């Protein structure tokens, strides 16, 4: 298998897996858990697997105080915060809609770079912003009384993930071995969400065997398939092509929502998805 084919396959597999996240979360919730508990187990149960992998490959676990401080910051306000917001949105709106709104993060990344880093923004990028906001408006319908809360949570998850993306690229954390950084981010996220779950009386150990098994597979595969697959794709086919192929994520989520959970999917929702995905593809294909 040549490197380009390998890059395409690993990126698609990664995107399809991430698109299955609502399925894992809802299975855990149906087995006695809740969205906050699912977020906790997603990070906590991955730690032993990551630790054993790092030790087996002789990777040092040491991290400087400066890098640790940066890791806590990017996790609380980005990486971990995103999971809490996105998972919580599943309680209010269809998972496919949640994932698609969340996938506005490439546009939020552009806005963040423009506003805070003073990067220049082309008219085409501004068009992408308009497409995304138009897509969100198409999602809204007056009959869905609780949808605004879910849409707001998914919307905020896109903003926090954009912060994670920008900060990760500008903070120097990328020099750290990928799985080592993921281990520390998962540890911080697990601690943060544990405190949140306990303080709100949403922490639970009363899961069915199926839910425990799902949580373990979910936690391990997210780090070892989702993250590594995407990184491999970026390495072999480049970030632009990898970004385009990652649009399989919201598409997968929408399909699972329809086939598994019989979630509604109107023409307006379809148009909303197309607007946002069009913006993502345009952003990914830009050279600047």
Model-identified regions with their sequence ranges:
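Glycine-/small-residue-enriched transmembrane alpha-helix faces in small-molecule transporters
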Residues: 1-37, 41, 143-170, 191
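C-terminal transmembrane-helix exit sites in multi-pass transporters
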Residues: 49, 54, 105-127, 137, ...
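Membrane-interface helix termini and inter-helical loops of multi-pass transporters
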Residues: 23-35, 59, 91, 137-149, ...
């Amino acid at each position: 298998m040549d490197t380009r084919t390998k890059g395409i396959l690993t990126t698609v597999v990664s995107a399809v897996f991430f698109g299955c996240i609502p399925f894992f979360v809802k299975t855990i919730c149906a087995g006695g858990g809740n969205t906050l508990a699912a977020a906790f187990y997603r990070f906590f149960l991955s730690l032993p697997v990551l630790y054993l992998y790092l030790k087996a490959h002789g990777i040092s676990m040491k991290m400087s105080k400066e890098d640790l401080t940066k890791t806590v910051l990017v996790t609380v306000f980005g990486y971990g915060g995103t999971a809490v917001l996105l998972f919580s949105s599943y309680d209010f709106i269809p998972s496919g809609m949640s994932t698609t709104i969340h996938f506005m993060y490439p546009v939020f990344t552009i806005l963040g770079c423009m506003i805070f880093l003073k990067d220049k923004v082309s008219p085409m990028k501004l068009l992408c912003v308009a497409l995304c906001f138009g897509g969100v408006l198409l999602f809204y319908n007056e009959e869905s009384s609780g949808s605004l809360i879910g849409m707001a949570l998914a919307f905020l998850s896109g903003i926090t993930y954009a912060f994670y993306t920008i900060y990760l690229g500008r903070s120097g954390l990328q020099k750290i071995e990928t799985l080592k950084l993921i281990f520390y981010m998962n540890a911080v996220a697990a601690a943060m969400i544990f405190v949140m779950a306990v303080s709100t009386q949403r922490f639970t150990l009363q899961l069915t065997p199926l839910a425990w098994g799902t949580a373990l597979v979910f936690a391990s595969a997210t780090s070892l398939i989702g993250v590594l697959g995407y990184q491999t794709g970026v390495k072999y086919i480049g970030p632009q092509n990898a970004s385009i192929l990652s649009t399989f994520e919201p598409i997968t989520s929408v399909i699972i929502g329809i086939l598994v959970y019989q979630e509604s999917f109107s023409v307006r929702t379809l148009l909303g998805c197309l607007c946002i995905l069009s913006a993502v593809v345009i952003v990914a294909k830009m050279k600047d």
